[in-house]
Amino acid sequence: MTDEPGVAAAERRGFRQRASGFALDITPLRRNPAFRRLWFGQGISFIGTEIAEVALAYQVYQLTGSTLAVGLISLTHLVPLLTLTVVGGAIADAFDRRRVMLVQQFGMVAGSLGLAGNAALSHPRVWPLYVFQFVISAAFSIGVGAQRSMTPQLVDESHFMAASALNSVTSQFGAVGGPGIAGLLIKFVDLKWVYLGDSLSYMGAIAAVALLPRLVAREDADRPSWSSIVAGFRYVRSQPVILGFFLVDTNAMIFGMPSALFPAMATHRFGDPSLVGYLYMAPAAGALLVSLLSGPLRHVRRQGLGVVITASLWGVAIAAFGFAQELWLALVLLALAGLGDQISAILRSVMLYRITPKEMLGRVSGIEFMQVAAAPSLGNLEAGALASATSLRFSIASGGVACVAGCLLLAAAFPALLRYGAQANAEA
């Protein structure tokens, strides 16, 4: 006679084991107190930043009534991004990365306090909003190379995949939850308190980073200079795998980034301008889902091929989104696009950590972030221009098709990317 309770218990254990295989691997948080402190500190800081950016856009529009004035905020991000990120990467490779990130966070505190002070005035001015946001963006750009190159110094190589997924959770959670929290705060509290809360979030990051060990790439590293910055670009050009996945992602973002068209899609395709928030949220929701269920990614061996496939998935989903007539289908397709993009991002991070020597990682991470942040802006420009000349459907659908075609061409041009695997350093 079968022991039914024993069979049932075994089935439950088997189900739990299968389910745990999909769950986010939190081993780096459990085993590495330094990484845990950095992760929590960055998470708090990121959510505060997302909230403050929504509040800033709201305040600029309230003071000016101009969408152009709101759009000009992007220049306070783009200019430091294109000019200071690679400089900051060279600084991160020359000095203690912990100290570089502390300077970054203190600079962001100063900018946030400036925004709070302006908001506390009886008649807030517009120009300080741009000045203080530029200060925040400049500080962030200088420190982002150090920030993104800390993980491989704090985590064992066998846990790079898990650490990359954990890092993506904080950014995607902020992207999904930050705007909603900002909306509630704007409704119920004065803006100065929102900005003060942002400054406190940076203080949380400062407290976490201050407790980290000293993190230097090399004790005898050269001082940052123009030649050291150029060396970073030369290194990227000399590495076909890194250059290949940089170009694959750039291709996907330039041809397949339709977010500038979301307001028009909500208004003209779905008949309700208020639905635009759901369109913006859907890709982030798909990306967050991937991060939370990223366990199977540790079994991916041919990570370069994975980047090409998931970038192509983004393109296919975006092309289909261009034809979607129902809101639910549009949201599913955008979430699927976000899912593909996030898998690609995690795989790219792991490859970057494994290939790049630590004395070059700050510069390469800075170049990568510049590419990741700038390419979507170019993509939105392309999508908007093409839509104005043709139609929403053609702009979005053709962009998705061009993304897939570009991925296939780049895969053929960079066979080393397709061959890249990490069998020797496979996840445990």
Label the model's feature ranges.
Residues 1-428:
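Alpha-helical transmembrane-bundle signature of multi-pass membrane transport and export proteins
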